[in-house]
Amino acid sequence: MSLTDTIRNTFVPIHREGYPFIAGFFVVSLILGWLWDPLFWIGMVLTVWCIYFYRDPERVTPMDDDLVISPADGKVSFVGPAVPPAELDLGAEPRMRVSVFMNVFSVHINRSPVRGKIEKVVHRPGKFLNAELDKASTENERNSVLIESPHGKIGVVQIAGLVARRIVCWSNEDDDLSVGERFGLIRFGSRVDVYLPADATVRVAVGQTAVAGETVLADYGSVRGEPVVRIG
């Protein structure tokens, strides 16, 4: 391992979305420490946790249009047919859905599962049920992204959870996304659903650990073994 790789693996970048929160925790720690010294260290523990939460590691993403890559870090919590949210305009027929649940210790940056153009971004208010529940797909607050990929339309839905109360999506309609490119995040535990085209074959199982930008969720049966690249 080179010195550059060692430094990269040791000092994981922090996403800019976390800067205000990290600064806020640090300032509060100073104020609490001024009141009582032990409170400073409690505040610093929370500050370090906030830094950890907003970590944004680089990922090595397979550059192959025949693959669908995980958009989130976490555990595969559901694999099976499900009707997509109406706002995606994918029809009323069930599609194969893969859900990845993120807990509070997961990296919360969301990445595009495919290369393509964003056709639609729709935010829907809703409840904040446990994101592991299946009904969270329809009842919880969510942000639905429709991507036109080389193999057809794919729906990616960011779902708020019991603790997560803030969905962030900085990509817009007509934006072009590369596979593995960051498009948003969800704070403090949540879920991402991927609705696949009919000809996609799922390659993961419930309970499996998924890594955003790296784990292959599905393929189209003609994987060519293209090279991988690091998505910073």
UniProtKB/Swiss-Prot annotation:
It is a peripheral membrane protein. One of its GO terms (molecular function) is phosphatidylserine decarboxylase activity. Keywords: Cell membrane, Decarboxylase, Lipid biosynthesis, Lipid metabolism, Lyase, Membrane, Phospholipid biosynthesis, Phospholipid metabolism, Pyruvate, Zymogen. It comes from the Bacteria. Binds 1 pyruvoyl group covalently per subunit. One of its GO terms (cellular component) is plasma membrane. Pathway: Phospholipid metabolism; phosphatidylethanolamine biosynthesis; phosphatidylethanolamine from CDP-diacylglycerol: step 2/2. InterPro entries: PS_Dcarbxylase, PSD-A. Its cofactor is pyruvate. It is found in: Cell membrane. Is synthesized initially as an inactive proenzyme. Formation of the active enzyme involves a self-maturation process in which the active site pyruvoyl group is generated from an internal serine residue via an autocatalytic post-translational modification. Two non-identical subunits are generated from the proenzyme in this reaction, and the pyruvate is formed at the N-terminus of the alpha chain, which is derived from the carboxyl end of the proenzyme. Catalyzes the formation of phosphatidylethanolamine (PtdEtn) from phosphatidylserine (PtdSer). The modification Pyruvic acid (Ser) is found at residue 190. Belongs to the phosphatidylserine decarboxylase family. PSD-A subfamily. One of its GO terms (biological process) is phosphatidylethanolamine biosynthetic process. Heterodimer of a large membrane-associated beta subunit and a small pyruvoyl-containing alpha subunit. The active site is at 190 (schiff-base intermediate with substrate). The gene is psd. Its main location: membrane. The record marks 189-190 as: Cleavage (non-hydrolytic). Pfam families: PS_Dcarbxylase (PF02666). Signal peptide: none annotated. This is Phosphatidylserine decarboxylase proenzyme. It catalyses: a 1,2-diacyl-sn-glycero-3-phospho-L-serine + H(+) = a 1,2-diacyl-sn-glycero-3-phosphoethanolamine + CO2.
